[in-house]
């Protein structure tokens, strides 16, 4: 997969990972790889991020959980790369090969929860947003959410 595609998936998912010693599988980004797409999933039990990209895909169905620390390291390395990222993994380790770097890390062992079961499938409400319009809208919406969280006892003025 291309470095920019992987960077986008990590950036969109990393904030939703947990810091939970009792549920270690939630402390990373779940890579759900199929022959059609790659889905980046992260959740801390309160928020869920599912980012599906059809630009990249695997040779066969596979999955692994990348811990938060290696994901953060990749987040810092990937902006320096423009080529493809090759991912090789087994049950315990993953190797990320970039043009100028190679990283081997230990994966989180365990089974990630079925994230599709908590996403409504027959939801009658759908929204289609032009990506250019979303870029103009998203930052103010995020600021409002952050402000309301910080001032949850008194509404923001």
Name these PLM-found stretches.
Residues 111:
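Glycine-rich, pocket-lining loop/helix-strand segments that form or immediately flank
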Residues 1-52, 56-108, 123-157:
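DNA polymerase processivity clamps
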Residues 118-122:
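Short hinge/gating elements
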């Amino acid at each position: 997969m291309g470095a920019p595609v992987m960077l986008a998936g990590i950036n969109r998912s990393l904030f939703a990972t947990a810091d939970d010693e009792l549920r270690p599988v939630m402390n990373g980004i779940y890579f759900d790889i199929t022959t059609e797409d790659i889905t980046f999933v992260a959740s801390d039990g309160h928020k869920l991020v599912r980012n599906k990209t059809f630009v990249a895909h695997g040779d066969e169905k596979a999955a692994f959980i990348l811990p938060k620390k290696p994901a953060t390291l990749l987040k810092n390395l990937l902006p320096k790369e423009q080529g493809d990222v090759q991912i090789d993994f087994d049950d315990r380790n993953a190797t990320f090969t970039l043009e100028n770097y190679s990283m081997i890390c230990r994966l989180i062992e365990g089974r990630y929860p079925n994230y599709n079961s908590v996403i409504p499938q027959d939801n009658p409400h759908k929204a289609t947003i032009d990506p250019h319009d979303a870029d103009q809208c998203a930052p103010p919406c995020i600021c409002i959410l952050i402000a309301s969280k910080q001032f949850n006892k008194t509404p923001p003025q």
